[in-house]
Amino acid sequence: MESAGIQQLLAAEREAQQIVNAARTAKMTRLKQAKEEAETEVAEHKTSTEQGFQRKLEATSGDSGANVKRLEQETDAKIEQLKNEATRISKDVVDMLLKNVTTVNN
């Protein structure tokens, strides 16, 4: 009788061990699946973020090129204006300098 009870306990222990092993295997499978899903989601988010960044970069760099061209045109116009102004007043400046240099004050 005792032998039958021991055999029954050993069988129950083996069954419990199989249940624990099955649960452990199922848990590991779920963890592996969750990790793969998380990695996929992270990769998708990274791709999406990178694409958004590239779109913004292209949009702003296009504006930057237009701004540079506009600034160059404005600078050239200002330089031309200053050259014209200098040419216009240079005779007056020379006359004023000659007058002040050649005039003696007592």
UniProtKB/Swiss-Prot annotation:
Its main location: membrane. Residues 31-67 are annotated as: Disordered. Residues 33-58 have a biased composition (Basic and acidic residues). One of its GO terms (cellular component) is vacuole. Transmembrane segments: none annotated. GO terms for molecular function: proton-transporting ATPase activity, rotational mechanism. Coiled coil: none annotated. Gene3D superfamilies: 1.20.5.2950. Belongs to the V-ATPase G subunit family. Catalytic subunit of the peripheral V1 complex of vacuolar ATPase (V-ATPase). V-ATPase is responsible for acidifying a variety of intracellular compartments in eukaryotic cells. V-ATPase is a heteromultimeric enzyme composed of a peripheral catalytic V1 complex (components A to H) attached to an integral membrane V0 proton pore complex (components: a, c, c'', d and e). This is V-type proton ATPase subunit G2. It comes from Arabidopsis thaliana. The gene is VHA-G2.
